[in-house]
């Protein structure tokens, strides 16, 4: 530990103590908040089922930065490199298309054995795993419908895929001792004016009920459902809208997933957290950065990321909110994208933990909105960076931008050798 870091740390402790904040307690609380990193940033959502196939479902990974992971071993190595540069507890979020098998496996036939290597790797790295059925980039999703498909046999295929995915998820939770959150997102929708908006939603409702009909141990598996405003090719109608899934999660008491990019550009999910928490048992967050649409840019330490973190901390939702990331940028170094986005999420959580929330609540309750605004703004200038640097030091990770040197060295030694 450098003298400069020690001095900054001691000063920060004093400054925060003056406003009633115990920074040591803040760091202890930060270690209670794992962030689930998404595997698909590492290979542009290609997966291993058909890595040369097209990405469909109204989503896009833009760019062609060299060094993309081509197989599970490369992806795990890249994840390890990124995780070494991110302090504190982490999880990994997998999609079904990241299975490993010597022979082709139909998506409705995936089994825990196809993810055994991921589980062993997670054990070795002390990680929890989360999961997602992959209802896109497949011949049977090519017409834009999956769980709401009008063809009974195609719809059943996707139902069976989601049911098989739940068993994989439960396997993760049982093996790793921490529940796997399995999120269902489907691309179903229509490009142009839709006459019958009801029938697809009726089919989706029945399909989801069949998907979750098998009782699984909640200590191992948590169901979540995710809405979306629109996707490319589904601009006019999305079957799984916000209202649909809010109603579903409320009536079935599943978790609800709120994705930062899946709403109108003037909406923010930070404002939805407290409302949804009144009705659903748990929330899954997909923290992202939409630029004019659901572009899935790398997460910044911006106002909305901070507001999301503050909502979690202010309302003590540590045990009810699961924090996941969802972005994929193929135009920059993919490992750097993971590191930047995940560190920013953790920085936002730390800043939220360093807020004098109790004092701010008193001012708000008393109607002293002048002091509330003044304190909120003054707090931004307190030396939270010194606390962050100490947190990084204790977790043996770089405190500042020196992590980029490690990424560059890895790029030169490893990524540049890939075809």
Curated annotation (Swiss-Prot):
Subcellular localization(s) per the UniProt record: Cytoplasm
Biological processes annotated in GO: L-lyxose metabolic process; rhamnose catabolic process
Stored SUPFAM superfamilies: Xylose isomerase-like
Stored HAMAP family: RhaA (MF_00541)
Domain of life, per lineage: Bacteria
NCBIfam families: PRK01076.1 (NF002203), rhaA (TIGR01748)
Gene3D superfamilies: Divalent-metal-dependent TIM barrel enzymes
GO function terms (MF aspect): L-rhamnose isomerase activity; manganese ion binding
Any one GO cellular component localisation term in the record: cytoplasm
Biological pathway: Carbohydrate degradation; L-rhamnose degradation; glycerone phosphate from L-rhamnose: step 1/3
Protein family according to the UniProt entry: Belongs to the rhamnose isomerase family.
Keyword flag NAD: no
Keywords: Cytoplasm, Isomerase, Manganese, Metal-binding, Rhamnose metabolism
Record keyword Kinase present: no
Source organism: Shigella sonnei (strain Ss046)
Catalyzed reaction equations: L-rhamnopyranose = L-rhamnulose
The protein's name: L-rhamnose isomerase
Chief place of localization: cytoplasm
Pfam families listed in its UniProt record: RhaA
Function recorded in the entry: Catalyzes the interconversion of L-rhamnose and L-rhamnulose.
Binding site for Mn(2+): 262, 294, 296
Cofactor annotation: Mn(2+)
Assembly mode: Homotetramer.
